């Protein structure tokens, strides 16, 4: 199985970039993982929220390949404890998911078409995080899940 984190816009904070690099390398010991970046829209400030969501949505939809299992990282999604997320990831591996595609939307969320395309929605917290920070938090949780699956000493209950 391959896991991809699809994000809108590049990561700009150097501390977050360093954390993403660190956890991406760690996750790479367990699964083929990458982060794909959809470029930010040009002149986005001139667009309404609805226009921005629609235009970003079209770019997101183009990045989805046939056979992808699409999971939106969305505040309205299902919440897991870390051990539950690990079991969920392990189940996806066991059913031979080709590519598990997690998507972080732009600042205003997802278009309706993206919601309709998604198979599942997952929430990392009821709290709101920046779209920059959520990238690092997700990759850390993915690493944590694989250490749980492989019985490695990282996660503590």
Which sequence ranges carry the predicted segments?
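S-adenosyl-L-methionine/SAH cofactor-binding core of RNA-modifying enzymes
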Residues: 32-33, 39-98
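Proline/glycine-rich low-complexity loops and linkers
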Residues: 105-106, 117
């Amino acid at each position: 199985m391959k896991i991809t984190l699809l994000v809108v816009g590049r990561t700009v904070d150097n501390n977050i970039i360093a954390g993403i690099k660190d956890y991406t390398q760690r996750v790479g010991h367990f699964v083929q993982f990458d982060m794909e970046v959809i470029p930010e829209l040009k002149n986005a400030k001139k667009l309404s929220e609805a226009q921005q969501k629609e235009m970003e949505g079209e770019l997101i939809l183009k990045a989805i390949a046939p056979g992808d299992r699409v999971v939106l990282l969305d505040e309205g999604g299902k919440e897991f404890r870390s051990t539950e997320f690990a079991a969920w990831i392990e189940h996806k591996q066991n059913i031979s998911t080709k590519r598990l595609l997690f998507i972080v939307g732009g600042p205003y969320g997802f278009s309706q078409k993206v919601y309709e395309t998604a198979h599942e929605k997952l929430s990392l917290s009821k709290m709101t995080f920046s779209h920059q920070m959520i990238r690092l938090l997700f990759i850390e949780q993915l690493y944590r899940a694989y250490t749980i699956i492989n019985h490695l000493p990282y996660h503590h209950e």
